[in-house]
Swiss-Prot record:
Gene symbol of the encoding locus: buk
EC top class named in words: transferase
Catalytic activity from the UniProt record: butanoate + ATP = butanoyl phosphate + ADP
Pfam family, one: Acetate_kinase
HAMAP family in UniProt: Butyrate_kinase
Protein name: Probable butyrate kinase
Amino acid sequence: MAYKLLIINPGSTSTKIGVYEGEKEILEETLRHSAEEILKYDTIFDQLDFRKEVILKVLKEKGIDINELDAVVGRGGMLKPIEGGTYEVNEAMVEDLKIGVQGPHASNLGGILSNEIAKEIGKRAFIVDPVVVDEMEDVARLSGVPELPRKSKFHALNQKAVAKRYAKEHNTSYEDVNLIVVHMGGGVSVGAHRKGRVIDVNNALDGDGPFSPERAGGVPSGELLEMCFSGKYSKEEVYKKLVGKGGFVAYANTNDARDLIKLSQEGDEKGSLIFNAFIYQIAKEIGSMAVVLDGEVNAIVLTGGIAYSDYVTNAINKKVKWIAPMVVYGGEDELLALAQGAIRVLDGVEEAKIYK
């Protein structure tokens, strides 16, 4: 049976929705919200009714009867650290999404919106593999400063989806393989997946790992300390240097990897150096994750928007092909990944996890 699902993925100025029958997409819409509209609301949670109305209006216009849905799936938000999987939305989760226990983020509305619509039609609401998925081993959490433990914040939804896709295409299960998965987008995350769990990964938001189009990645801590206390920058300005204005933006004033690739291909000296450093840092992180997996790696999987570039993937492969074969799944399909997570539960392949 092909389940009919509504998928909701809220962003800061848009809400992406999809309607699926099984894994087949029958509708995809990006509902854009103007800055003026968003600014009317003091908090992200205050946008709930507005976003819900917009979603229901578009579904009606497109001839989608919500009463025919089997479930509603939302993008998971900044919850407490949880293990990966599909979670049924419950009151404890809704409360934590409302307050944003790990910070405010538009994705916090995903679970709440899905729950609101599912309640109206008497169906179940789910979230799948939010960014706060944390399966790190205790040994990976120590940083050298007890007050600053390493944290798991990464592209969990896409990393898990492509890892499961690899397993399926190779007639095995995610729980039976060891993979190094590299997501390359606005941020870069490199995860060590051992038998179905991401036992180590860089904090791709504001922690460590390779620099990326907009993020600094790991930086020298002594110099960062000097910068923080120099009196030249506010806390917000320093944070912007790490997230938003770091990486390619800082070095080349662009957040588009294609610009850097073009400069490198044309032999531009500065552009080539930045591009080579980007490849170098990703390859180095892959190498460290190979050590985490004791050298037992079935494959290195590259994904995210930048993985569409053969120039990038070939450059990485040149450095790491001695570790394991490389597989490339360019881009990311978050709506499909969310649908697949719900289908696994509805089909009885997995049990829905309970958020506490």
